[in-house]
Amino acid sequence: MDVAKKLVVSKNQLIEWRRHFHKYPELSFQEEKTSQFVFDILREIPCLEVSRPTKYSVMARLIGKQPGKTIAVRADMDALPIHEENEFDFISTYPGVMHACGHDGHIAILLGVVHKLVEAREKIKGEIRFLFQHAEENFPGGAEEMVAAGVMEGVDYIIGAHLWASLEVGKVGVIYGPAMAAPDVFKIIIEGKGGHAGIPHETVDSIAIGTQVVSQLQQIVSRLTNPLDSLVVSVTQFHAGTTHNVIPEQAEIEGTVRSLRHELREETEKRIEQIVKHVTEAYGAKYTFSYEYGYRPVVNDYKVTEIIEQTALQLYGRERVTRLQPTMAGEDFSAFLQKAPGTFFFIGAGNKEKGIIYPHHHPRFTIDEDALPIGVQVFVSSIMNFISKGE
């Protein structure tokens, strides 16, 4: 605990790092300068073994002087293809690319964690493994690549976190069990028979059939799924036609499915295709259907989550620690959880008084930078608690 509470002196450094990453964002699988910046910082820190497990990721290992468990800590580094509309002096210098999800803060936090734990290395037992991950935002994701490169070999526990705009700055949120959804994608192509819009009876109207499909898909959640199961089926694209007087031969529908159980993903895939099949057959059309499985759901381990929660309670008290409901957003942190138990918690970063009110992936998204030292405190103190408990 003593180590973490000294952090206030380096808050300015955390902010400086975060603003640097915010000014120079890079998209998924393009994090060349970001990863090099991180690598160069870590390489200057004594006692670290620093490597590049994949082209755009960085790993650092801090080996304790006594045996113990191996704890991994992860931060993601990629930005989004969004044109920033903020007006502060460190906005993105790259048009159409922006840190609109807080990953700039995640990198800064983990760099702070590295520095604080290196200062406390005499107390470290086992190994702390720091994972700076590329490409969280873009499936198939960087986590799978890092796992394939062996970064989770020998890891006993893994911890990750997200700066969270809907949670007030100063608060820490935890979720026991299923925490974040599996984000799957489906695509439907309806093949009808095109023709004159004024003579519709001679056509097989792909638009009319497509609207029936979209309407019927809403029944999956409302009538075919247990209300106690969390499921989202959202149509997000519908493309058909090029002019006002032609009924198009083809309509394309795309959307996403979000769920917290793998079994429910499989059931939903089958139900979507059943609906498409029956509707198109009824109107004499044909179809093609594809379903792409995204990241697995993030399911937090009870014991690891409890240590994070108890640590946050020790630091801040009950009024600043909350148990959140699962979110239907997706996260490839789940790839790491396939290899070791762990937890993914949330660091409050919103502040209505400062106008920090915009949601993730919004062109005016930002974070309250007061959240940065809080994130470092929770990570560092939790790791020290793991070590002291012999977990």
Give, region by region, the residue ranges found by the protein language model:
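Structural motif
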Residues: 69-72, 128-129, 156-159, 211, ...
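Divalent metal-coordination and catalytic microenvironments
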Residues: 21, 60, 73, 103, ...
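Histidine/acidic-residue-rich, glycine-tolerant segments that coordinate divalent metal ions
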Residues: 80-82, 86-98, 105, 111, ...
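Non-cysteine beta-strand/loop elements that form the S-adenosyl-L-methionine
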Residues: 72-74, 83, 186, 344-349
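Acidic/His- and Gly-rich active-site-bordering loop/insert found
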Residues: 1-99, 104, 108, 115-124
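Metal-dependent amide/peptide-bond hydrolase catalytic core
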Residues: 208-391
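Active-site beta-loop-alpha junctions enriched in small/polar residues
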Residues: 26, 76-78, 135-137, 164, ...
